[in-house]
């Protein structure tokens, strides 16, 4: 009997002994503090590294500790990847808001909390345990944990903060807005003044270009007669909308001031004559006269014409 006991003791001592329990490298991101708005979806990632055995399995558990309270188990993924809910999260309504998935086997695990509420604010802890079979028994070889704090900002607080930011921003740009309005007003006034100056100049030039009637007295010609001419510089009168029928202009009677020669009853037209050699006359015996003919403008109906008919007689001075 004693020999058997000694043999068993030697076998136990000589057989493979389990490794000493160590620590896994566990990291939770984002962290250590993360902020979410009320109603958003939160995602927490649990990274695991430095496993002691290649064939080992991992059991992942998430704990939740509200502000000023002890942590409580929320959800667990067993070594066989079975999801289990605990506490208040075991209810169907809460189960739909909480999801635990394995992104990469034995490396990355994701916890999603949907439609955040103010009661979801607190500390979230991820605890991982490495398990494997030894002598037909499941043995824990190592474990590790990491935590992060989640803060849920209510909509009212978010609106207040955004309103304050907008208020500060508006106060900053308010002065710039006033200055911009003043600059625009000055620009508009300058444009209006420039337009008025141009309009006034155009009207002034139009008035200056109006033509008036002047009676010009010409000096006496060689025959001792005085010729009175009319200069017309008046602009064209505006035409009426309807075209008037053309009427034959009848020359008016010769004014009384113009001298009428007794010997000439009717004006005679000059006929082309043959060239005749005439004696040269000195320049002293010649009298020059210039007559500028201006075609009169069409006068409106009922307005007297400004055309003057004059007969000029030339007499050669005797030496």
Curated annotation (Swiss-Prot):
Glycans are attached at residues 25, 41, 143. It is found in: Cell membrane. It is a single-pass type I membrane protein. Residues 1-23 form the signal peptide. SUPFAM superfamilies: Immunoglobulin (SSF48726). Proteolytically cleaved to generate a bioactive peptide. Residues 24-154 form the Ig-like domain. The keyword Protein transport does not apply. It comes from the Eukaryota. One of its GO terms (cellular component) is extracellular region. Pfam families: V-set. Keywords: Cell membrane, Disulfide bond, Glycoprotein, Immunoglobulin domain, Membrane, Secreted, Signal, Transmembrane, Transmembrane helix. Peptide Lv is widely expressed in various tissues and the central nervous system, including the retinal photoreceptor layer, hippocampus, olfactory bulb, and cerebellum. Disulfide bonds join 46-126. Its main location: membrane. GO terms for biological process: endothelial cell migration; endothelial cell proliferation; retina blood vessel maintenance; retina vasculature development in camera-type eye; sprouting angiogenesis; vasodilation. The chain crosses the membrane at residues 180-200. Peptide Lv enhances L-type voltage-gated calcium channel (L-VGCC) currents in retinal photoreceptors. PANTHER family: V-SET AND TRANSMEMBRANE DOMAIN-CONTAINING PROTEIN, V-SET AND TRANSMEMBRANE DOMAIN-CONTAINING PROTEIN 4. This is V-set and transmembrane domain-containing protein 4. It comes from Mus musculus. The lineage of its organism: Eukaryota, Metazoa, Chordata, Craniata, Vertebrata. The gene is Vstm4.
């Amino acid at each position: 009997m004693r020999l058997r006991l000694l043999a068993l003791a030697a076998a136990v001592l000589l057989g493979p002994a389990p490794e000493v329990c160590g620590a896994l490298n566990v990291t939770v991101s984002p962290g250590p503090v993360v902020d979410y708005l009320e109603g958003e979806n939160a995602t927490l990632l649990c990274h695991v590294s430095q496993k002691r055995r290649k064939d080992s399995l991992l059991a992942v558990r998430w704990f939740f500790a509200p502000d000023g309270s002890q942590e409580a188990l929320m959800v667990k993924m067993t070594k066989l990847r079975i999801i289990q809910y605990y506490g208040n999260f075991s209810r169907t309504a809460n189960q739909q808001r909480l999801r635990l998935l394995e992104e990469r086997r034995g490396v990355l695990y994701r916890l999603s909390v949907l439609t955040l509420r103010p009661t979801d604010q607190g500390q979230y802890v991820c605890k991982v345990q490495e398990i494997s079979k030894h002598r037909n028994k499941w043995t824990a070889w190592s474990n590790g944990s990491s935590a992060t704090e989640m803060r849920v900002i209510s909509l009212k607080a978010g609106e207040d903060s955004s309103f304050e930011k907008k208020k500060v921003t508006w106060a900053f740009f308010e002065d710039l807005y006033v200055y911009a309005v003043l600059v625009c007003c000055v620009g508009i006034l300058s444009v209006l003044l420039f337009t008025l100056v141009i309009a006034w100049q155009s009207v002034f030039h139009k008035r200056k270009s109006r033509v008036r009637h002047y009676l010009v007295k010409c000096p006496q010609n060689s025959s001792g007669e005085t010729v009175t001419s009319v200069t017309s510089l008046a602009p064209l009168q505006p035409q009426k909308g309807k075209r008037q029928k053309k009427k034959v202009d009848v020359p008016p009677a010769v004014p009384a001031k113009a001298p009428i020669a007794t010997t000439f009853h009717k004006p005679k037209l000059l006929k082309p004559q043959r060239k005749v050699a005439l004696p040269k006359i000195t320049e002293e015996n010649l009298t020059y006269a210039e007559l500028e003919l201006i075609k009169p403008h069409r006068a409106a109906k009922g307005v007297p014409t400004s055309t003057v008919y004059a007969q000029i007689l030339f007499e050669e001075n005797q030496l």
